[in-house]
Amino acid sequence: MSYYVAHRLFAAHDRALAAQLAHHLARKLGEDHVFLPFCDTDEENLVADVKGRRLFELDRDRLRRIRALIAIVHGPSPDDGVCMEIGYAAARGVPVILLTTDFQDYSTAPDGPRTDFPDPLLDALATRTVRLPRLSATTEPSGTSRFADFARRNQAQARQAIDACVDATLQLPAPAADTPAPSPSSNTVYTEPSPYVPPHHPLSVLTRNPHVTTISQTRFEAPDPLTAARRDWTAALASARILVDASGPETPPGAALLIGAACAIGRPAAAYLSRSSYTHAAGREPNCRNLMIQYGVDAILRSTEEVTTWIGR
């Protein structure tokens, strides 16, 4: 069993940070026990008939046999592929460690309760959060420039965060058996709206079906968002199907987490996505969403009619 390092992987600086984390984990655990996406799937050089789907399959197959997942998560728009992987691991009962150097807290109201991440469901699913939000202490000037000195402080902060994350990983308890998936409630659909669209968006209207019991998220309006997030998670995993609104610059964190959960426990899931911007990478088919999202769902619904049909089937 291996330790899976989940990270945003489109830019060199993100890959470099994840590689440093994987390197320091491997020094303690052995290289064969650490898996780093992009690196260990040889993503840049991989050749396949449908490359994006093949990359999804390689990552999903590794997620099925991991000891723990360590995810780098930061900023107001967490990577949707990383969130999918977190949801997958959490639904199987695999420990999840979240590493962040973000200096911001988040809330749904100016004076509301604060969380470490923009979606309280991330806080709720973390076995442990390793957070180092401040720059390292000022050191002696390098004598080169203030920019070089600032870079050194940021690099030291990242190193300290990695060291703390490795320590947290080594302190995890012995692995337990996989968490069995709850028995689904027949004719129940859990719906996850997008926080990036108005409340009157079609998803909330179209899910009203007299023959189907629909349940939706409660955490963004709750006085105790963490407790509500845990209830949302339990309700989603106990539903017969999961429908998410994937609208936004990326798939919203909650939607991505639930797609991962559905994929892990074999629950049918669909994503409503009325508009797409496509990504293109060498040797890869055009993708309407992150690979872990596009191939992690059973259906992508493009119209209100398709949503209505999927809900009522």
Regions flagged by a language model, labelled:
Residues 1-313:
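Conserved catalytic or regulatory cores that recognize and/or transform ribose-phosphate-containing ligands
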